[in-house]
Amino acid sequence: NIKLNFDGIYLIMFITFEGIEGSGKSTQVKLLKAALEKIHFDVESTREPGWGRVGSLIRKIILDYDDIEIEPITELSLFCADRAQHVQEFIKPKLSQGKIVLCDRFYDSTIAYQGYGRGLDPEMVKKLGFGAALGIIPTVTFLIDISVNTALSRIIERPGRNRIDDESFEFHSRVRKSYLSLHNKQPNRICLIDGEKDIDSVQSEIRRTLRNRFSIFKRLDKLG
């Protein structure tokens, strides 16, 4: 498998996926991982929250325990604790080995959900979120954008809804608005993808963006 090693120095290729609930991020991570492995890249995929034993416990507290009330600041702290553990134990080591890492959510989610969705001070959220990332910055972020109406219609159809899935229309609207604002402020890193399209079209747009921006991904052309 191909590792990103040039003259003994490993390049960082950390690709994150963002979007409101029901945007199809997880599906796109799986499809891109399979495509990159098909052309012999060494790829790892992961998610937040929920990597590893600590992350799994934190995910269960945050998402599944609908019978307990979690204060927004507590929720933020749990997400940041999950990220610090995740970065230190998984993301940093994999990147240092020259592997491509695909991550379903990273610190942009914290800004959107806890900063704007929950109404916490955005500057405080940014500082804590970035601090928990331990200096790791995504190489590129794919923001898969869908309307809140589309999101809610997809959420209703899927099994195992969680506490955040069941938030109000207004909550999801604030989160989406925050994501679009982040894209407008950082268009070079955060690539806006139309998630209203079918799954294959979304994946094609993601691959096209990677081919156009990074020469190492030119071989994605072979996959169509």
Model features per residue range: what roles?
Residues 1-12:
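N-terminal amphipathic/basic-hydrophobic helices that include classical n-h-c signal peptides
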Residues 15-17:
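Hydrophobic anchor at the beta1->P-loop junction of P-loop NTPases
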Residues 25:
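Conserved lysine of the Walker
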Residues 28:
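Hydrophobic positions on the alpha1 helix immediately C-terminal to the Walker A/P-loop
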Residues 33, 149-224:
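NTP-dependent small-molecule kinase module
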Residues 105, 109-177:
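A glycine- and Lys/Arg-enriched "phosphate-lid" helix/loop adjacent to the NTP-binding pocket
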